[in-house]
Amino acid sequence: MPTPLSRRKFITQTSLTAVGLTFFSCAASKKSSAVVPGLQLGYSAITWGGNDAQAIKDIAALGFKGIQLRSNTVKDYGGNPQMLRDLLQQNRLELPMFSSGNANINTGDDAGVIASHVANAKFVKALGGKNIQLTNSSRPKTGSPTKEDLEKYGRLLTEIGKQTQALGVQSNYHNHMGQLGQTPEEVDIILGATDPAFVKLELDVAHYKQGGGDPAKAIYQYKDRLHALHLKDVRDNPAGNSGAYTFVELGQGRVDLPAVFKALRDIHYKGWGIVELDSVPSKDKTPVQCANITKDYLKSIGIMS
């Protein structure tokens, strides 16, 4: 028969074990609730400021499976896309998205705009990629765009999408501050004017947040159009700083990223989430240091191992 002392010891040990198990269970639950089984993680080369060869090596070493390149690579590798494709393969990186750039409705030469993106799509196909990202520089300098302009942009996107799809390359609209599609209402009009058979959505969660929207809500709303995401964070700048906001590493801003990942899980999302940081948020950081901050955050919520 146990003595009173051993009984107390047993009760104490049992209680501590229960507390430990509860803590572990809560921590595990917090991580598992964020996991999105169909999510593949990539990283954008934009932070490296055009040094794409270094970006490829660094992003691969960080453990990301894909990289987003930009149209500047056409200048560097357009004459020999196989060289770039070999570099991607050597580093075991896919090309889930390519920034094709500006689709401006105000050039007076829609055919030329379309042709430039079709040319980029051919380059992407030569690299083994299947997606291009489309933005615009069509927002008026003062005031808001008209519904007619937003719908015109949607029609232009559709024409680009028809021709790139014929090549086996998907066109994706990217919402963006300072462009047509800055606000959630504008995004909705643009998407409503596009043909979903030819244009998909690449949702940038930080731009959507900065434009006054709820990125998690957008994921539910556009689940049938959502083809890719920019995983991004943003913070407000203190008064007196240049600019109202700064894009920052994941977990360092005010985007509710756990809600974003929950929404992706809820809709059974299968596709790419591409981390993007336009530039280092402070001059004392390198692109790799910023990427490691983001990686640590993704590991802390169970998205990366």
Where in the sequence are the language-model features?
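Vicinal oxygen chelate
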Residues: 101, 137, 241-245
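Acidic-and-aromatic substrate-binding clefts and catalytic sites of carbohydrate-active enzymes
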Residues: 46-53, 70-81, 103-113, 140-144, ...
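Active-site acidic/histidine proton-transfer and metal-coordination neighborhood
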Residues: 14-16, 20-23, 107-201
